[in-house]
Amino acid sequence: MRVHYLWLLLILGHVASARYSSANDWTVDHPQTLFAWEGACIRIPCKYKTPLPKARLDNILLFQNYEFDKATKKFTGTVLYNATKTEKDPESELYLSKQGRVTFLGNRIDNCTLKIHPIRANDSGNLGLRMTAGTERWMEPIHLNVSEKPFQPYIQMPSEIRESQSVTLTCGLNFSCFGYDILLKWFLEDSEITSITSSVTSITSSVTSSIKNVYTESKLTFQPKWTDHGKSVKCQVQHSSKVLSERTVRLDVKYTPKLEIKVNPTEVEKNNSVTMTCRVNSSNPKLRTVAVSWFKDGRPLEDQELEQEQQMSKLILHSVTKDMRGKYRCQASNDIGPGESEEVELTVHYAPEPSRVHIYPSPAEEGQSVELICESLASPSATNYTWYHNRKPIPGDTQEKLRIPKVSPWHAGNYSCLAENRLGHGKIDQEAKLDVHYAPKAVTTVIQSFTPILEGDSVTLVCRYNSSNPDVTSYRWNPQGSGSVLKPGVLRIQKVTWDSMPVSCAACNHKCSWALPVILNVHYAPRDVKVLKVSPASEIRAGQRVLLQCDFAESNPAEVRFFWKKNGSLVQEGRYLSFGSVSPEDSGNYNCMVNNSIGETLSQAWNLQVLYAPRRLRVSISPGDHVMEGKKATLSCESDANPPISQYTWFDSSGQDLHSSGQKLRLEPLEVQHTGSYRCKGTNGIGTGESPPSTLTVYYSPETIGKRVALGLGFCLTICILAIWGMKIQKKWKQNRSQQGLQENSSGQSFFVRNKKARRTPLSEGPQSQGCYNPAMDDTVSYAILRFPESDTHNTGDAGTPATQAPPPNNSDSVTYSVIQKRPMGDYENVNPSCPEDESIHYSELVQFGAGKRPQAKEDVDYVTLKH
């Protein structure tokens, strides 16, 4: 309990000390005095800082004519504004912005700016701004100066204003309030200055509203003239185009003395007198003493008669000479500096002085424009001039300048002039020489060689000219490097070519003049001989008409003859070579030859290519037309065609397409079946040609022959064995025959039929086929069964109906017929048999045992042929 009491005492002591020190810790900044007038507004810029860094305003009051009540220890007075933080939004930064005429523009942190609108005259005096932040409180006095009428602006001027020096005037008003705008305008002698002119440099306006000052300013920067001295400058305050107040000041412009000079008379004849006066018209500050200085052509005058009077000075010139002509001015000084008068020119009249001539340009180039000027001092100026060329008058030219538009060599010479005015004429002082430069004249190139000039000869040329100013210093030749220079102006050309270009020379001083080109006229044999095809326009085909022309580019002399050669042999003479119907045999290399009296020239060979369809086709067989089977054979289709054959087609002896499009047909490996005739067909862009047939014979190899011989021997051995067995069977048959004769009622019979088969005649050899017929290819075994009809008792229905036909009781009631045809031995397809064909054996057997009636049935015959 005691500890808590000690802590409470410490907290109360801290609060008390904070209250006691709060008066020293508040900081409030605002303008010391604010100015306004009845009906305007006042904006009070204000910044504050509470004793506690994070403290915020809880309450703000604005009192008018406030007092402190010592009894209640509170401030009393008219409350113009009272705002307290709201319970709904205690953290808000702004209070209620406006109460009556007062608007709070600050916040709860550091801004206490206020605005009173409209302001009243009775608002003058002190306002009290009461601010509370927690336990901290503060009363800040604010002084207002409100007048019933708008007060005048102030104008700040520099201490001294000088003419032509830039100065700045400042018009200010200790007033600025947003929502009540004012304008500051400048006037010079009641004329508003609205824009930048030659004398007005700038007009700037600014508004300042800070915690230190509140004012509106306008600055006028200009360069005053001396005539602006004493003029009024006015600054006017306006609101909504209404003049509120104004202030006027007078300009005190300091300037140098302003002088006026007069000459009487300004034009005087030689030896007369002249009086000049200089008057001081104005000066600020004024001249202490009149001390006037005189100047002629910018130089001070000395030892002249002067008369000084108040504010005036006189200069008297006696017995005026021409040297006294010129420009005069006077000068006087004050504390600012010297002032000068304008210049006046004194003219002294006299007769022309001796003249001289100036030539422009000199020396002159031929063709240039030349101007000659006659220089003769005179006053008044000379009105008439007489020009002389080589001391002879030039009629028609009476001006000061003599102009020659295009000078030529004959214009060269000495020139002089004579000037004249109303006081008399002058004299000729000295002559001027006109020197006209021109390039060499009449330049020519001369050939100093024998003519005619032949190709390969040497030629000498000389460059000559008529006149030149200045003299010729060098020569040039065109084309450059065409020869060697023997000496200046002489050129030697070694081995002149047939196409030598024309040669010209130039003689040069500071300019070059070229001679006309001289043609060497070199004689030479015909050049660039060539063969031209006149017709046809496109490719040449057999049967067309062809016309060739012999052409050449150059020939000197021009008379020529033409000759034609084919493959080096002379064909005919003439410019044209014609083929009525060209053939392949006309193909070859053609040259045309052109000759003149100098020599002959042969053209390059021109190849005449005649296009024609394939011809002379034939089939060549490699390695030969008789080839053993198993090897390979290559058939080539040889032809004559232009252009070459692009597609080949091969056919066999039967005319069948072998589907080979190449020039060569390869057969590998060869078989006997490849034997036959072959032909080829070739096609190019012109047409198609076909070869006659060529025969290829393929014979058996020894291996094949051996195999077939062995097969034949085996077959013969088989026949012999069968023959032996046949004899045995025959013998057996003869034995059984006697027994069969005893059986009369027997219907069975057995017999052999021998049938000799005629051998097919071998085919004759031909180019398409070789060999003979081979019976072994037709080996057959024939077999037949003859069934006997059944007895009549069983023939109750259709014999062909399977339902009523009963099978025979046994297989003995049948007839068997067979043919055995033996395979021939040693028979080959392409070898004739060495012995006749063995005959075939036919065997049949008819057997029927038992007695009784035959069953009546439809006789059936089954016949079977077996081939192997």
Swiss-Prot record:
Membrane-side (Extracellular) residue stretches: 22-708
Motif ITIM motif 3 location, chain numbering: 861-866
Gene3D superfamilies reported in the protein's UniProt record: Immunoglobulins (2.60.40.10)
Distribution of this protein across tissues and organs: B-lymphocytes.
Consequences of knocking out this gene: In Cd22-deficiency mice, B-cell development is normal. There are normal numbers of peripheral B cells, but these have a more mature phenotype. In addition, recirculating B-cells are absent from the bone marrow. Deficiency results also in elevated Ca(2+) mobilization in response to BCR stimulation and a lower survival due to an increased induction of apoptosis.
GO molecular function: carbohydrate binding; CD4 receptor binding; coreceptor activity; protein phosphatase binding; sialic acid binding
Ranges annotated as spanning the membrane: 709-727
UniProt entry keywords in alphabetical sequence: Cell adhesion, Cell membrane, Disulfide bond, Glycoprotein, Immunoglobulin domain, Lectin, Membrane, Phosphoprotein, Repeat, Signal, Transmembrane, Transmembrane helix
Subcellular compartments: Cell membrane
Pfam families assigned: C2-set_2, Ig_3, Ig_CD22
Main localization category: membrane
GO cellular component: cell surface; early endosome; external side of plasma membrane; neuronal cell body membrane; plasma membrane; recycling endosome
Motif (ITIM motif 2): 841-846
Keyword Glycoprotein recorded: yes
Disulfide bonds: C41-C177, C46-C112, C171-C235, C278-C330, C374-C417, C463-C505, C550-C592, C637-C680
Ig-like C2-type domain span: 153-250, 257-347, 352-435, 440-521, 526-603, 614-697
Family to which the UniProt record says this protein belongs: Belongs to the immunoglobulin superfamily. SIGLEC (sialic acid binding Ig-like lectin) family.
Protein name: B-cell receptor CD22
Natural source organism: Mus musculus
Taxonomic path: Eukaryota, Metazoa, Chordata, Craniata, Vertebrata
